[in-house]
Curated annotation (Swiss-Prot):
Lineage: Eukaryota, Metazoa, Chordata, Craniata, Vertebrata
Pfam families: NADH_dehy_S2_C, Proton_antipo_M
The EC number(s) this enzyme carries: 7.1.1.2
Subunit structure: Core subunit of respiratory chain NADH dehydrogenase (Complex I) which is composed of 45 different subunits. Interacts with TMEM242.
Family to which the UniProt record says this protein belongs: Belongs to the complex I subunit 2 family.
Subcellular location: Mitochondrion inner membrane
Protein name, UniProt field: NADH-ubiquinone oxidoreductase chain 2
Catalytic activity annotation: a ubiquinone + NADH + 5 H(+)(in) = a ubiquinol + NAD(+) + 4 H(+)(out)
A GO biological-process term: mitochondrial respiratory chain complex I assembly
Enzyme class: translocase
InterPro entries registered for this protein in UniProt: Complex_I_Subunit_2 (IPR050175), NADH_DH_su2_C (IPR010933), NADH_UbQ_OxRdtase_chain2 (IPR003917), ND/Mrp_TM (IPR001750)
Gene: MT-ND2
């Protein structure tokens, strides 16, 4: 990518997300999504190779299809209700089409097949933007229409997403695909609580972005893209050895780390609404998610399956780029649970 074009591309992505999040008119919300999509394609093809080109094409086709469904829903909603405001999606069929379009953009099951493939075909930092920043604009639209969405449809999509994300990551050795399937699972949890408490969805999204950003930065520092490379991190960057397992455990939702907080609050929200079956199913399925994180943690330990690790520690440490925000992110990733009473007061 041309260095002179980078500020324009990233500012367009930022502007598109901001327009969608702050817009109260359906047309401008759609324009913001289109700006965001078109500006993000050069980010995916930062390294020009057939794999990144394939990932960009898959991303474009999926997002363009979702945008077409969204535009159809906007026009039908205007014809039937005469309203252009984003908070007024009163028509049942229009609301259903909007949810389907946003589910495609967010990578929810059964529209999730593009997420692992696109993430795998991009560099680590582009994958970070795909799994974090690119969820803000669709999530803002879902937040605005949360009062008029079909609860049964959202719960069905959420449980399918949790199942697809947890099951799909079991046989993966590529770290980017594992994080992509983890993203599908987290989006399922966010959407499940949206009809009951939209603010809880925002809290879940914030914590998810913190956890995922920390994980990608650690993997980028160690240049690890597979479980085999991750197992050799300890002899290159010894200080990463305790940080990567704790971050992965938090991302998997193991108490008492930060990742357990959103799941705990969401389960509590369901119990307040006298629904015990749905959170039980979600929690049981998510245990599969925690399993493949435990497998990754075993790979970063002293042993390497199925034999002991004979790799010697390097006497000279490798130079790494300074990451001033990483200590703060690691602290938030592991120690945010103790301040949960304050968060409950705010919500």
């Amino acid at each position: 990518m041309n260095p002179l074009a980078q500020p324009i591309i990233y500012s367009t992505i930022f502007a598109g997300t901001l327009i969608t999040a702050l817009s109260s008119h359906w047309f401008f919300a759609w324009v913001g999504l289109e700006m965001n999509m078109l500006a993000f394609i050069p980010v995916l093809t930062k390294k020009m190779n057939p794999r990144s080109t394939e990932a960009a094409i898959k991303y474009f086709l999926t997002q363009a299809t979702a945008s077409m469904i969204l535009l159809m829903a906007i026009l039908s909603n205007n014809m039937l209700s005469g309203q252009w405001t984003t908070t007024n999606a009163t028509n049942q069929y229009s609301s259903l089409m909007i949810v389907v379009a946003m589910a495609m953009k967010l990578g929810m099951a059964p529209f999730h097949f593009w997420v692992p493939e696109v993430t795998q075909g991009t560099p680590l930092m582009s994958g970070l933007l795909l799994l974090t920043w690119q969820k803000l604009a669709p999530m803002s639209i879902m937040y605005q229409i949360s009062s008029s969405t079909n609860v049964s449809l959202l719960l069905t999509l959420s449980i399918l997403s949790i199942l697809a994300g947890s099951w799909g990551g079991l046989n993966q050795t590529q770290l980017r695909k594992i994080l992509a399937y983890s993203s599908i699972t987290h989006v399922g949890w966010m959407m499940a609580v949206l009809p009951y408490n939209p603010n809880m969805t925002i809290l879940n999204l914030t914590i998810y972005i913190i956890l995922t950003t920390t994980t990608f930065l650690l993997l980028n520092l160690s240049s690890s893209t597979t479980t085999l490379l991750l197992s050799r991190t300890w002899n290159k960057l010894t200080w990463l050895t305790p940080l990567i397992p704790s971050t992965l455990l938090s991302l998997g939702g193991l108490p008492p780390l930060t990742g357990f907080l959103p799941k705990w609050l969401i389960i509590e929200e369901f119990t307040k609404n006298n629904d015990l079956i749905t959170p039980t199913i979600m929690a049981i399925i998510t245990l599969l998610n925690l399993y493949f994180y435990l497998r990754l943690i075993y790979s970063t330990s002293i042993t390497l399956l199925p034999m002991s690790n004979n790799v010697k520690m390097k006497w000279q440490l490798e130079y790494t780029k300074p990451t001033p925000f990483l200590p703060t992110l690691i602290t938030l990733t592991t120690l945010l649970l103790p301040i949960s009473p304050f968060m409950l007061m705010v919500l």
